[in-house]
């Protein structure tokens, strides 16, 4: 057993193509949202990306091969670039670099971000991109506006789901022996609205109506969806194992 993973949790996930689909969708959503920010804020497309914090270690469950992960991220950026007609994103050629000490990179990044002149070129802390259709950079959305934003957010989520049936993405994932089948994508879409509604209902407080929403609405259709997909994928994996032993 791995001393850092005594319950073999990582091995359980990586040995299941069904469970790996959830990991891929989660990672892809983060990279897709990064592309949204780069587009709306009109930022220069980075040449290199490294992941910080201990939480980022889960990314290596997908692959520890930097070249393959670089290809996947570049395809995600290119897909979104095509949707919004951003030629810089379309031509993205991202190089992923893993750090042996992600916590150290986090600390160093914090110091760099506070330095001049870089600080002047960063997105302000109080400016949040939500990813809804036809969003204008810098627009504040309040909790009282949640319901009116629902259609735009779900439209955006459906476009995100289209990533996984895009030929270029299918080819990139195939290098890892993985895929996101059509029925998986369709099930995600089915859960999306109820997932959004759960977050909406949790925040439907008149006292909060005038306050700005503090987290990206882009992820609202995904929160409950990933939980439900994890349960379904786990059950599918168990069923497949039973069939193998029959």
Set out the residue ranges of the language-model regions.
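Helical "lid/coupling" subdomains associated with nucleotide-phosphate turnover
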Residues: 1-246
């Amino acid at each position: 057993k791995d001393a850092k993973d005594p319950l073999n949790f990582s091995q359980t996930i990586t040995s299941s193509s069904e469970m790996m689909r959830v990991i891929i969708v989660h990672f892809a959503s983060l990279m897709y949202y990064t592309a949204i920010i780069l587009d709306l804020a009109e930022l220069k497309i980075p040449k290199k990306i490294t992941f910080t914090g201990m939480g980022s270690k889960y990314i290596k469950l997908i692959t520890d091969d930097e070249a393959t992960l670089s290809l996947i991220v570049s395809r995600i950026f290119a897909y979104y670039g095509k949707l919004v007609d951003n030629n810089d994103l379309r031509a993205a050629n991202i190089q992923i670099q893993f750090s042996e000490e992600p916590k150290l990179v986090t600390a160093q990044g914090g110091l760099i971000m506070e330095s001049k002149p870089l600080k002047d070129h960063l997105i302000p802390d109080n400016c949040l991109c939500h990813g809804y259709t036809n969003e204008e950079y810098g627009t504040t959305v309040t909790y009282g506006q949640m319901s009116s934003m629902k259609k735009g957010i779900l439209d955006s989520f459906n476009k995100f789901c289209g990533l996984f049936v895009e030929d270029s993405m299918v080819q990139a994932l195939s290098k890892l022996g993985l895929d996101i089948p059509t029925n998986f994508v369709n099930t995600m879409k089915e859960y999306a609205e109820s997932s959004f509604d759960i977050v909406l209902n949790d925040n439907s407080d008149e006292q909060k109506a005038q306050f700005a929403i503090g987290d990206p609405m882009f992820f609202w259709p995904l929160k409950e969806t990933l939980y439900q997909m994890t349960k379904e994928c786990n059950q599918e994996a168990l069923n497949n194992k039973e069939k193998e032993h029959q």
